[in-house]
């Protein structure tokens, strides 16, 4: 069943979505670069004129969430560093509408593709090029017609398109053997014809605004999933903590009467939907009194927590000592455990959701 879920997720990521007849076609070789006016993560607004000092211009359509795009982030930075002194300017554009992205398309990332999250990625990765947001309407991106993230367009001094396609031939960092974008730049800088002007592009499909219905459909499907809660005793807790499977486990301890628990709980539901098709499992444990099991189930149902949910049926202090010796006992409490039972992350109190997602994705992996 999990293998089928992963296969479906791969289809969502990578298959061409031919049902969208309005998907744009790539700009043709020899065409002029369409102008744009887009906000950058650095607070500036950029048009083509902002790059007039460069003899050549590389526009890369990329995004935060896509594992392929993330796999190429460092390579794009390296290209920008290598060719800046040769008169080559670089700019990255995110064409994706954030509202057209399903949570289960975020399984390889800590960040989605909102403008605010782009600012975080640009800061975290210290991009050495402007990173522009076109997710409001995707209008500028449609004029270029990127087919996947990442997709490279290289223009000469007259801003005529000379190369379009992939960066290189291998997604996995350090394994490329054909460096198409680099070869194109070398030729242009040397005043020679580009050896290969156009290639196909492998990566995540562009999340155009007309794909919002697809994302909304997922929300409706998740709302129909069954929610259950089982009782958990001390022996079962120890088995759970040994984590003898292959998945990383995120354990959230909560109660219906705990205000901070209730406030942060939707973050865990989101993380479950993001990462559950990976080597990841969310487990929630309620410390409500056992006679309030129906109340706990009612809360979980309202929150659509269709994960593995428990309510502890033993002594609370025995539970505290049995879960984590470093836990003082206040709720909420969160643990992230590796296969084999090693505690990677422990937090008493409300989590920093972004920080926790970073911990998770660095363990389960950002790329294929």
Residue ranges with predicted function:
Residues 1-24:
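Bacterial Sec-dependent N-terminal signal peptides
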Residues 18-35, 177-178, 182, 188, ...:
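N-proximal helix/coil linker or "cap" segments that precede and/or mark the start of modular domains
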Residues 36, 150-167, 331-346:
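A short, hydrophobic beta-strand/beta-hairpin element that forms part of a small beta-sheet core
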Residues 36-57, 228-249, 269-274, 320-323:
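A short beta-strand-turn-helix
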Residues 55-57, 62-65, 247-249, 253-257, ...:
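Short pre-active-site segment immediately N-terminal to redox-active cysteine/selenocysteine motifs
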Residues 63-75, 253-270:
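Conserved redox-active cysteine motifs that mediate thiol-disulfide chemistry
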Residues 87-111, 127-137, 279-293, 305-315:
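Thiol-based oxidoreductase modules, predominantly thioredoxin-like and allied folds used
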Residues 110-149, 153-154, 162, 297-331:
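Short, internal strand/loop/helix patches
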């Amino acid at each position: 069943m999990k293998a089928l879920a992963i296969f479906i997720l791969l289809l969502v990521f990578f298959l061409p979505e031919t049902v969208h007849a309005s998907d744009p076609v790539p700009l043709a070789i020899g065409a002029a670069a369409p102008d744009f006016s887009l906000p950058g993560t650095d607070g500036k607004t950029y048009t083509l004129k902002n790059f007039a000092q460069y003899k050549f211009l590389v526009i890369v359509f990329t995004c935060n969430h896509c594992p392929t795009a993330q796999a190429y982030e460092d390579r794009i930075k390296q290209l920008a560093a290598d060719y800046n002194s040769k008169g080559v300017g670089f700019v990255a554009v995110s064409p994706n509408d954030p509202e057209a992205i399903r949570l289960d398309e975020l399984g390889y990332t800590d960040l989605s593709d909102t403008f605010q999250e782009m600012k975080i990625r640009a800061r975290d990765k210290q991009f050495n090029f402007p990173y522009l947001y076109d997710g409001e309407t995707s209008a500028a991106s449609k004029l270029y017609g990127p087919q996947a993230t990442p997709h490279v367009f290289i223009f000469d001094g007259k801003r005529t398109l000379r190369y379009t396609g992939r960066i290189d031939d291998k997604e996995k960092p350090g394994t490329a053997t054909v460096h198409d974008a680099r070869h194109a730049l070398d030729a242009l800088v040397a005043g020679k014809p580009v050896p290969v002007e156009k290639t196909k592009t492998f990566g995540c499909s562009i999340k155009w605004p007309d794909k919002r219905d697809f994302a909304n459909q997922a929300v409706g499907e998740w709302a129909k999933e069954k929610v259950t809660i089982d009782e958990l005793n001390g022996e079962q807790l120890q088995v759970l903590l040994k984590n003898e499977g292959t998945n990383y486990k995120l354990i959230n301890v909560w109660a219906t009467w705990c205000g901070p628990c209730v406030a942060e709980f939707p973050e865990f539901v989101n993380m479950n939907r993001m990462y559950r098709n990976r080597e990841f499992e969310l487990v929630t444990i309620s410390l409500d009194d056992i006679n309030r099991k129906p109340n706990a189930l009612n809360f979980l149902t309202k929150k659509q927590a269709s994960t593995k949910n428990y309510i502890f049926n033993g002594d609370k202090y025995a539970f505290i000592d049995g879960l984590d010796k470093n836990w003082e006992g206040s709720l909420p409490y969160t643990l992230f455990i590796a296969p084999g039972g090693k505690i990677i992350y422990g937090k008493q109190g409300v989590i920093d959701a972004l920080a926790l997602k970073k911990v998770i994705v660095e363990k389960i992996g950002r790329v294929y």
